[in-house]
Structures are given as structure tokens and as C-alpha cells.
């Protein structure tokens, strides 16, 4: 709602039951969502489809790139989930990320575009005929609840951690600057 353009590319392998949420996100005028190498069939038939066409569906995308304005990119092993960002009270994955700027960010953007524009990257809406789309109202309500929960969790966090600019300024001197080269596989 702030005019920011968002493109979200997700691998389809472990996303059963989330199509309503994805379509709801994709319905926002500034958000585009694509699935990489989708299984085709949705619901219970998805698993059977995978078993029958395993060679085709074994080609997955494991890239993680968070790119802002083509100027800075965060890359690493984190998936999208509370447990990857210290927000899950019962489980927390420890992972490493790298922040790249300049030419490295440009290369990260090119890598993202390579996968975004690949024939295996499919807009979520293309998986459903107009008459068979999931109900987006319930998904929208679920997103509102999730956003409210996130606000509550973040409000409990240390105020310094929420002030990103101050945090970046305070950690700038401890960053390690090095040359970069972004390498990805082919889509």
C-alpha cells in the first residue's frame, strides 16, 4: 500500500494449501507472485502428480534473494518463516546471510530475473480457471491476523532492533567488505 513493487518467486514443492494466500497477495496491484516449476495439479492430486512425474518435478529452485531497489541484496539460507527470524517461541533456525551492494546486488538482480522470466516460473493465477479460484476473502482475513500477530511480536522486541537505520549505522564498522560474484544454477 506504500507504492513498493514486490515480486515474490517461490518454489512450489512444500507449499500445499497456501494457494488462497498466494492469490490474495497476488491480487494486490503492487504484488506479483509466481511459483517455480509448479506441480500442475493442486490439492491431493499434487502428490500423485509428483510421484508420476518425479524427474520433471525434481528440478527445484533453492535461491534466496531479498533485493531492494537493485542496490542491496540479502542472500543466504533462510526460508520465509517465523522460525528463521527468531520469532517462533518453540524453534529457531540459526543461519547466515550475506549483504551485497554495488555489482553484487546487480548480479543478484540478474539472477532473480533469470528465474522470474524462466518458462518454469508460472503466475499463480494461471493455475486456476476463473471458475475454480479459491475464496480469497478467508485468505485475506488470515493475512490480516498474521500481520496483527507480527506487529504484536515486533512490539515486544527490543526498540533498538526495530530502528534499522540506527542498527545499520552502529554495525557498519564491523562489516567485512569483500569482492563478490553471484553464481546460480540455470532455471
Report residues per predicted region.
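Charged, low-complexity intrinsically disordered terminal segments
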Residues: 1-64, 68-187
Amino acid at each position: 500500500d506504500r507504492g513498493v513493487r514486490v515480486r515474490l518467486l517461490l518454489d512450489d514443492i512444500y507449499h500445499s494449501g497456501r494457494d488462497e494466500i498466494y492469490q490474495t497477495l497476488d491480487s494486490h496491484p503492487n504484488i506479483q507472485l509466481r511459483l517455480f516449476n509448479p506441480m500442475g495439479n493442486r490439492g491431493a492430486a499434487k502428490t500423485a502428480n509428483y510421484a508420476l512425474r518425479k524427474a520433471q518435478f525434481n528440478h527445484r529452485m533453492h535461491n534466496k534473494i531479498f533485493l531492494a531497489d537493485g542496490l542491496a541484496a540479502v542472500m543466504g539460507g533462510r526460508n520465509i518463516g517465523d522460525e528463521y527470524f527468531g520469532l517462533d517461541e518453540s524453534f529457531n533456525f540459526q543461519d547466515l546471510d550475506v549483504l551485497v551492494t554495488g555489482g553484487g546486488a546487480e548480479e543478484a538482480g540478474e539472477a532473480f530475473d533469470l528465474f522470474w522470466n524462466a518458462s518454469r516460473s508460472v503466475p499463480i493465477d494461471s493455475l486456476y480457471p476463473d471458475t475454480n479460484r479459491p475464496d480469497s476473502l478467508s485468505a485475506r482475513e488470515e493475512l490480516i491476523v498474521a500481520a496483527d500477530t507480527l506487529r504484536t511480536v515486533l512490539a515486544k522486541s527490543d526498540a533498538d532492533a526495530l530502528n534499522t537505520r540506527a542498527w545499520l549505522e552502529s554495525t557498519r564498522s564491523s562489516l567485512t567488505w569483500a569482492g563478490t560474484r553471484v553464481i546460480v544454477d540455470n532455471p
